[in-house]
């Protein structure tokens, strides 16, 4: 997971800072590492894309006997209450974006949900307009 953070490209005009907390004794994931890396990469890219010029991203990983919890939080534009469930649907794009020119076709979070659920996990979202978004992924031990 740390490799995904290090490989993140910062777009021109953005200042991105990361805060990460990975448990030192966390075992390697036995879930599909490519898919797990793609999920994290997608969440990071969304945090950057849907934030202003100064982006703060917090990534926290917790591990216990039940599995792994991965949380990605940002200080971005946030998601309106009526759109929080819709953002996980294919091709859905928020109508509350301050910049309608943000690229994308609305597949990222549907992909995240699909991969997480294929690993028998869950994904949840907390967000307020203007206050950022927190997405939490839970993967059970059986999927690891």
Model regions and ranges:
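Conserved catalytic submotifs in the C-terminal HATPase_c
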Residues: 17-27
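Short beta-strand/loop element within the Bergerat-fold HATPase_c
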Residues: 54-66
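Short helix-loop "hinge" at the ATP-lid/N-box region of the Bergerat-fold HATPase_c
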Residues: 47-48
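Acidic ATP/Mg2+-coordinating residue in the GHKL
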Residues: 74
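Short helix N-cap motif at coil->helix boundaries in the Bergerat
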Residues: 78-89
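Short alpha-helical Gxxx[C/S/T] motif in the catalytic ATP-binding
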Residues: 84, 103, 108, 112
């Amino acid at each position: 997971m740390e490799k995904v953070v290090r490989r993140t490209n910062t777009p021109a005009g953005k200042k991105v800072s990361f805060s990460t907390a990975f448990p030192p004794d966390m075992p390697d994931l036995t879930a599909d590492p490519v898919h797990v890396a793609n999920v994290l990469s997608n969440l990071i890219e969304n945090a950057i894309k849907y934030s202003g010029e100064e982006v703060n991203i917090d990534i926290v990983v917790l591990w216990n006997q039940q599995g792994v919890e991965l949380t990605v939080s940002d200080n971005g534009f946030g998601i309106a209450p009526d759109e929080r469930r819709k953002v996980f649907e294919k091709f859905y794009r928020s109508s509350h974006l301050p910049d309608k020119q943000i690229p994308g076709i609305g597949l990222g979070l549907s992909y995240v949900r699909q991969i997480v659920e294929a690993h028998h996990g869950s994904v949840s979202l907390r967000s307020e307009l203007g206050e950022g978004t927190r997405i939490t992924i839970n993967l059970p031990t059986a999927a690891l």
